Amino acid sequence: LNISFSLIFWYNYSIKDLEVFMLDFSTMIYRIPALLFAITIHEYAHAQCADSMGDPTPRHMGRLTFNPMAHLDLMGAFLLVLVGFGWAKPVAINQNNFRNRKEGIIKDSLAGPAANLFACFLAAFMAALLNKFGMMGDGMYKFLLWMQLYNVWFAFFNLLPIPPLDGSKLVSEM
């Protein structure tokens, strides 16, 4: 398999396939699970990283979980599905608890976007594999396409150096 950045949007990709402005049930059945996964993996990665760097705050606040409800801001998720812009519930961290404050902030800021990029490439790999063996149905195609889109969008958007996004924390520690 040839895995490259172009694989992110694999065979016969077109904006029509994404049905970006379609808000009917047949579109939401693929978009909502992909969105919940992207939000959950992003925020869980922040929580896990902070915990591993010495900050128990996310664990104490119940954020060290794959349960999407712990990470979901209902209004932010609703707007993300509806208009393409929204937010999740940010993971609270106490930078003073990090064993190495600067390293902790940098690693924690990169954890969410890195998890999203990994999920994006995993979805692309799964799509290529399923397609190669002729096991790609229309539903799986749409779901994996939305998984890639939401995850790559979350990763790059969160790296913008605009407070309170992860990119602004990176810039402040450089």
Per-range role (PLM):
Residues 2-174:
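Hydrophobic transmembrane alpha-helices and their immediate loop junctions
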